[in-house]
């Protein structure tokens, strides 16, 4: 029996299936940055500091392991790698019923929503296929693109998670980022599993997820799995 089937069988007879709160495929540099400085429409992941070996290309060098896989959702031509990296890319939508993201992940605007034509980075068919809750202090009405509905909420992590779990209808909730949002949910101790892909680059400045991943080991088990692509997959799950 697979782990998935065991979980499904255990849920039979329970009033409510356990819903996990998950971070998946979250990319950081070796020095712990998930985005560079100065994020904008032209540079969604910001810019890296200049290093002796040159300047990292963002997001290319940070997330190239995912772009290169056969299961990358934006792939327009046949091909791509299989193996460990592809497994994580392919696993991204499994049992996810809702996502929570920060406003910075949704788009580059700050303050009041002046440009309502902006509907995210993802075009007419976003890759989420679930309700998405965008954390913001400014009101904006919900809207749908294909099978994804974006809701804009001014809420602390606990309340945002309550709404997302209700919308997920028994499935898991993904904390999608950006960096500040993942940090907030870690600080609130609301995350059950965390997958971070550490790229073999340094960014030097910007938004930092951690100074050291070892700071999480009082709360999480850790398995570190290197990939032939050069990234190291860090898999955390609650103690």
Question: What do the PLM-derived regions correspond to, one by one?
Answer:
Residues 2-239:
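Enzymes that bind and transform nitrogen-containing heteroaromatic metabolites
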């Amino acid at each position: 029996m697979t782990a998935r089937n065991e979980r499904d069988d255990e849920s039979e007879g329970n009033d409510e299936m356990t819903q996990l709160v998950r971070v998946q495929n979250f990319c950081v540099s070796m020095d712990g940055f998930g985005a560079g400085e100065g994020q904008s429409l032209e540079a969604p992941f910001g810019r890296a500091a200049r290093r002796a070996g040159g300047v990292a290309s963002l997001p290319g060098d940070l997330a190239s392991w995912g772009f290169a896989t056969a299961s990358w959702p934006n792939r327009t031509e046949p091909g791509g790698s299989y193996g460990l990296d592809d497994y994580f890319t392919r696993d991204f939508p499994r049992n996810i019923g809702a996502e929570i993201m920060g406003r910075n992940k949704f788009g580059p605007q700050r303050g009041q929503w002046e440009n309502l034509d902006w509907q995210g980075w993802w075009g007419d068919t976003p890759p989420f296929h679930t309700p998405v809750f965008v954390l913001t202090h400014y009101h904006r009405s919900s809207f749908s693109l294909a099978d994804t509905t974006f809701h804009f909420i001014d809420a602390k992590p606990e309340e945002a998670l309550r709404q997302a779990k209700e919308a997920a209808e028994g499935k898991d909730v993904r904390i999608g980022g950006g960096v500040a949002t993942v940090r907030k949910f870690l600080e609130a101790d609301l995350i059950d599993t965390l997958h971070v892909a550490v790229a073999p680059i340094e960014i030097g400045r910007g938004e930092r997820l951690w100074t050291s991943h070892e700071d999480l080991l009082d709360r999480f088990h850790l398995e570190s799995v290197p990939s032939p692509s050069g990234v190291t997959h860090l898999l955390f799950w609650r103690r």
